[in-house]
Amino acid sequence: MRPSGARTSVSSSPSRMWGMTDSIASIIAHELGVEVPRVQATIDLLDGGATVPFIARYRKEVTGGMDDGQLRQLEQRLDYLRELAARKETILKSIEEQGKLTDELRQKILAVDTKARLEDLYLPFKKSRRTKAAIAREAGLGELVEKLLAGGSLDLAEGYVQEGFADAASVMAGARAIVVEDISTDADLVGEIREEYFKRGRAESAVIEGKEEEGQKYRDYFEFDEPFGDLPSHRVLALLRGENEGVLRVNFAPGEDDEFYQGIIADRTGLQAQGDPADKFRAECVRFGWRTKLAVSSAVDVRMRLKEKADQAAVSVFSKNLKDLLLAAPAGHRATLGLDPGYRNGVKCAVVDGTGKVLDTVVVYPHSGQWDKARTILSTLVNKHGVELLAVGNGTASRETEKLAKEIAGLAEGTKPQTVVISEAGASVYSASEVAAQEFPDMDVSLRGAVSIARRLQDPLAELVKIDPKSIGVGQYQHDVNQALLAAGLDTVVEDAVNSVGVDVNLASAPLLNRVAGVTPTLAENIVAYRDENGAFKSRKELLKVPRLGPKAFEQAAGFLRINGAADP
């Protein structure tokens, strides 16, 4: 969740970083199809500390009605373009300090719209270790390169033999290193080769010898070959996981023979055959430039691009799955018995009342020869507390425990409780968390999971916000994707979900309040502490009495906080 304080920003007004006309606001406006003044006004709101949920709901007149999705896209692009602008500034300063910044290069850098292209332009000016090419240049071999490329004889190398270059062969190797470095730092050439590689290349994989048995889940990839453009994100992640587990040998191949790419290099650098003595040298430079530099860097780039694209697609799917879980219809304020299934360690059980308060806990062992005893104990609890819902976790022993729950329901006096099997993903993580320890300091860790299972049936959103979104189990490859990207994406979903339905300020836990627009973790704790000391809030204005909850935070949060029974609920 973004802190309620103002953002750190690089100016988004037209500046020398963006050339004469294009501001960050105008770039985003063009991409989103929104008027520039509306984008700029929205950026100003974000910089002032306003959150996306607040802007989406209460500043429609400023944004022109942009929804949560558009505002999130604007926010992401704003961060990217500001990072790009800052990087441009750094690179321009570096090249200027080297005395190599021309007006043409400055304009090229200012016009760049991607980080990859920017780094391509910076390649020739990067300060790096002394390369073979640098050593060769210091030895004066740059002059030899000029003579050779002008059609000079290879015998000229004899005249450059010196310390460090003991014979003609080592001199020619030094000359070649100079040309190869020039090839590998030509921004336009690097970009063209990279795009051709991505357009024409193929992902290939094969099983590593001896891994056939243990790698059966990857059998679809034992003899695999598919164009990059046809690879769905889940297949990319499967290939990379198989490679990481030592089952698959994965290769991101160029898709064309070497001659195709070498032809592009020769054409773009003027290293085609000229029918003179230096043709062999030219061909050798092109071949080395491709095989040792551009083929390697292009394969690395493809791997990164495919992974990034797969990560983004996967996070999008995971986010939708999480949203569905969070916004699942709550069962409501009904007494619930939560059952956390298990074999040897028993079934952990907890009864909570309609507000989620824990009334009773017990561990029974129906799957260890004590079925009848377990049924009797739980039937007694159901009747004692008027339980209306039986929430069964879907983990180990779930099916057998569900059968037990249905028998218990059949024995209930009066209205028969309803049995529901729900996801228990993250319950064990919650059980051992600091939040759970604060909530139930005297309760055994194993029983906390049963409480969580019962409560998440009553109100999924209120309970699931206590758990790290990554622990809820939202997708098959969630541990393979970029974890920072995943955390940010899922965090956004939780924030939007909480603010879309609002929060009862007199019932909400600190973790739930923390997800409300403008409410920081400290502020959430202060709200709960004030409520515990002074009783339920009577009105929204009373929130201003909470320590550190000032007018700015109140403006952001008030619209998302409900006070049932108040004059302004």
Please identify what each model-predicted range represents.
Residues 21-24, 76, 82-101, 110, ...:
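Long, highly charged, low-complexity intrinsically disordered interaction regions
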Residues 335-352, 358, 374, 378, ...:
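Extended, hydrophobic alpha-helical segments in both membrane/secreted and soluble proteins
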Residues 34-69:
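N-terminal cofactor/phosphate-binding cores enriched in small/glycine residues
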Residues 367-379, 398, 548-568:
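Phosphate-backbone recognition surface of nucleic-acid-processing proteins
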